[in-house]
């Protein structure tokens, strides 16, 4: 029995992502094998994990058991809280070091860094949670366009006199005192809380994180510009602040500026009104690192786009790094000059997707820990299973649970969580269905909805069907067998193959990744 489980665990570890393996398979333990009845009992430490493993992995474990014993084996799952304790005693694997990425020039694509992610992915389970900017921090960065002065922090006198210097990251000394550190962050507008160390990593963002680390290590050289896009609350702002903070550690005197696109627009307007464009250009053209957040706000602002184009050209010519975020793919941003779009596409463009289940759990557990609350795994899994869209939604739900618990003087449990999130859960229950996914994908690829259920296998039908299966797994709570049934009674192994195939290709194929992003945004409304 133990020999089989070692064999089974080793195979599943190769087939699954590190985070999936650590979350679902590692806590399991074989407890009994009846050779006469051909039954194997496997224990899970809590009810949620038992139900999830039973629905998602029982078929694969049964297949491996049949191959191992050369006879059909009935796999039974039982509840045993000690199973988790036994697994925990084995210890966690040490985090892998950051793997460097090899720059491929200005035409680099997502595929260019995919092959370098092995070491970074291995570190994913131990990475702490994403901590997006709080509303108060965001307000400090996004000054009101009607009452803000032109926001051009002055450089230290000795730097201003020295003129433009070619800068490379090096082992810079830390600020000598707190006042100097405060001044450094005031000039850069960086949030010192947002670092690589407290950014949780999973399949949804590992490419973006790896690219960000590479840029932090080689600013102005590897991928310039770096363009990150994705929905609200997925960690784009966190990552670009992390890059800036890393550069400040490497070189305390670096000229860095984070600015939201709305503030940049406001500054352009005020510079125009006050005839202060020389100062404006002198400041932005002298930076070592420019971080522009939510550039879609440039849409329709022709004068702002013109000034940014000149700043972009000057910075890139001086080997300074430019990093941009948006809520959508560059070519999908309306009202932006074609010259700028072509510049955005000249570097590396990476999508950040909504976090997967294991990543959402890690974010909740870490956030609860930072609030001094011991959140049970069952509650974290319950919340993560029902709230799927972004990190801010998860954190908002957690705050609601904590407030509800404190107000009623009750311990946090699944029952209390259901009460606290009653309105949220009602909305979620009305969301995406497999049928809606099938119709949306069929329309997108110009095939019939009936082809989703048919046995036809030409590529122009089989491919969209696999994509629909992948989206059904990612965006609904249906199990693999349930999804297979809704796709013409297909076996769960067929669905699993489709999910793995599309997930793997997505990490390597920028066009497929873009198509999936469009479909996901369409389905989420």
Curated annotation (Swiss-Prot):
> Mind telling me which residue stretches traverse the membrane in this protein?
none
Where is the protein found, in the record's own terms?
Answer: Cytoplasm
Gene3D superfamilies in UniProt: 1.10.1750.10, 1.10.8.60, 3.30.300.180, P-loop containing nucleotide triphosphate hydrolases
This protein's name: Chromosomal replication initiator protein DnaA
Q: Which organism is it from?
A: Burkholderia orbicola (strain MC0-3)
For this record, the Gene Ontology CC terms, alphabetical, are: cytoplasm; plasma membrane
Q: Which InterPro entries match?
A: AAA+_ATPase (IPR003593), Chromosome_initiator_DnaA (IPR001957), Chromosome_initiator_DnaA-like (IPR020591), Chromosome_initiator_DnaA_CS (IPR018312), DnaA_C (IPR013159), DnaA_dom (IPR013317), DnaA_N_dom (IPR024633), DnaA_N_sf (IPR038454)
Q: Report residue spans for region: Domain I, interacts with DnaA modulators.
A: 1-71
Q: Which gene encodes it?
A: dnaA
In this chain, composition skew of type Low complexity spans: 169-181
